[in-house]
């Protein structure tokens, strides 16, 4: 009986993937986000005429604007 319960517990953990963390691009590399970070962001700006600034990473909250794009799936902020 204990073996059956243990097997069911292991199967449940594997199926639910309790340790899942979002993966986002940050500085051109894929990073694993902290558990409370549910969004990837991609922010583009031009602080100077000939300089395009791109910021990418993980965020716990995200507001979408013209320059800031938000998404919630792995590697979606390229």
Curated annotation (Swiss-Prot):
Keyword Nucleus attributed: no
Record has Secreted as a keyword: yes
Protein's job: This three-finger toxin inhibits ASIC channels. It acts as a gating modifier toxin by decreasing the apparent proton sensitivity of activation and by slightly increasing the apparent proton sensitivity for inactivation. It binds more tightly to the closed state and to a much lesser extent the inactivated/desensitized state of ASIC1a isoform of ASIC1. It interacts directly with the outside surface of the thumb domain of chicken ASIC1a (ASIC1a), but does not insert into the acidic pocket as suggested for mambalgin-2.
Consequence of substituting residue 42 to A: 3.1-fold decrease in inhibitory potency of ASIC1a
Protein name according to UniProt: Mambalgin-1
Residue ranges the record marks as coiled coil: none
Subcellular location: Secreted
Sites marked Important residue for inhibition of rat ASIC1a: 48-49, 54-55
Pfam hit, one: Toxin_cobra-type
Primary site of residence: secreted
């Amino acid at each position: 009986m204990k073996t059956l319960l243990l097997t069911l517990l292991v199967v449940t953990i594997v199926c639910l993937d309790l340790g899942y963390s979002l993966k986002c691009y940050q500085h051109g590399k894929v990073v694993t986000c902290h558990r409370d970070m549910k969004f990837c962001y991609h922010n583009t700006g031009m602080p100077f005429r000939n300089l395009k600034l791109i910021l990418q990473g993980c965020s716990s909250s995200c507001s979408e604007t013209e320059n800031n794009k938000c998404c919630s799936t792995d590697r979606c902020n390229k």
